[in-house]
Amino acid sequence: DHTSIASFPGMKERTIYLNGFSKAFAMTGWRIGYICGPKELIQQMVKIHQYTTLCAPIISQYGAIEALKNSIPDMLSMRDSFARRRRLIFEGFKGLGMEIVEPKGALYVFPSIEKYGLSGEEFAIRLLEEENVAVVPGDAFGEGFEKYIRCSYATSIEQIKESIVRIGRFVKRLEEEKKSLEKYLPHDLIYRKK
């Protein structure tokens, strides 16, 4: 369970909370968010903000008000739906024998592709060409993610299931290719990329 740092003694006046409506209320593209914190700090932030950005569009502001007033049950339902999708994709990759850490938030997972001997980009391009499944190479998200791919589960249950089937076929072919290479090439040539 998540515990807000602001709930600890003496921390409310030392905490800044920044959030938006994109994920919680499915308002992606509306470009509206908010910040909570000590009044004195927020006043200083407003001085900078008012000269660097325009206000959120009126329709976005009304949408946010409606979301806060009447959409909490919908938000809870979406949260449960995404938890089911997260579990499905996580278990799917585990079932394929891929190393993966179950995320606690976000709308994507990062399975490891290290054992297949391809870079994230090579893996992503081949997967798209061979199985028509789009993933993002992990190195697009910074150093240390070179041996991972990012897979979104912000889609239907059916698409997640079908994607896992297709990725399963793809990694099986990669494993067969690797075994075939191992028969004919010296061990140090196969694993030189590491």
Language-model segments: residues:
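PLP-dependent class I/II
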Residues: 1-194
